[in-house]
Amino acid sequence: MPQNEYIEQHIKQHGRRLDHDERKRKREAREAHKISEKAQKLTGWKGKQFAKKRYAEKVAMKKKIRAHEQSKVKGGSKPLDENGEALPTYLLDREQNNTAKAISSSIKQKRLEKADKFSVPLPKVRGISEEEMFKVVKTGKSKSKAWKRMITKHTFVGEGFTRRPVKMERIIRPSALRQKKANVTHPELGVTVFLPILAVKKNPQSPMYTQLGVLTKGTIIEVNVSELGMVTSGGKVVWGKYAQITNEPDRDGCVNAVLLV
């Protein structure tokens, strides 16, 4: 167990106080009084910050309540035909129930389908240690400082990327190891296209590597597929699509990926 989780460790070993739930309930009940006291007594900059925070909380709560109320609204459908024309009088009494909840649930379902995980070609990859990923760069007059690190793997940086000042740059991404394009294979069509990389979506090694844009085997990247002429069911052109890297770019010198369709 990590060193900073000693409280959780103690709870697991010895349990909680017998009156823990009661104390927690009372603490939560006192919270409103404490907030009220702070709102009345705090002045100056602290008072302004507190008021700003409370205002944001109230706005968020009102939005949440309004959204919850709208999701349960039921009412008659508008007297309009599907093509936007007014219904004749003899059809006005045939009101079809319009349930906002059903609409919102269908939208949620679509979002879930969109966010659904792909069955990736490489479900498991080898772990990479920090010693393998980073090389220590010694700096200073006598080369005694060792706080800088250089990434030894291929990386992707965006179009408008600029390096930080050398004195403050802790992690170096060498220009020679930066990739802008990838050889992407379409699994159904069986064609390979040289497409530009848009972003690094997920590196399976660590969230930090995702943030740094490190390209290793199994990494999910977003590529520009506008050249393939792919369209959605609604007829819109697809620009970005996810692909998984299937090779080791630092060994091959290029990025090979399979499109996730």
Swiss-Prot record:
Keywords: Nucleus, Ribonucleoprotein, Ribosome biogenesis, rRNA processing. It comes from the Eukaryota. A motif (Nuclear localization signal 2) lies at residues 51-58. The keyword tRNA-binding does not apply. Disulfide bonds: none annotated. It is found in: Nucleus, Nucleolus. Its main location: nucleus. One of its GO terms (biological process) is rRNA processing. Pfam families: Ribosomal_S8e. The keyword Nucleus applies. GO terms for cellular component: nucleolus; ribonucleoprotein complex. A motif (Nuclear localization signal 1) lies at residues 15-22. CDD domains: NSA2. This is Ribosome biogenesis protein NSA2. Involved in the biogenesis of the 60S ribosomal subunit. May play a part in the quality control of pre-60S particles. It comes from Kluyveromyces lactis (strain ATCC 8585 / CBS 2359 / DSM 70799 / NBRC 1267 / NRRL Y-1140 / WM37). Residues 1-39, 62-82 are annotated as: Disordered. Belongs to the eukaryotic ribosomal protein eS8 family. Ribosome biogenesis protein NSA2 subfamily. Component of the pre-66S ribosomal particle. Interacts with NOP7 and RRP1. Interacts with RSA4 (via WD repeats). Residues 7-39 have a biased composition (Basic and acidic residues). InterPro entries: NSA2_fam, Ribosomal_Se8/biogenesis_NSA2.
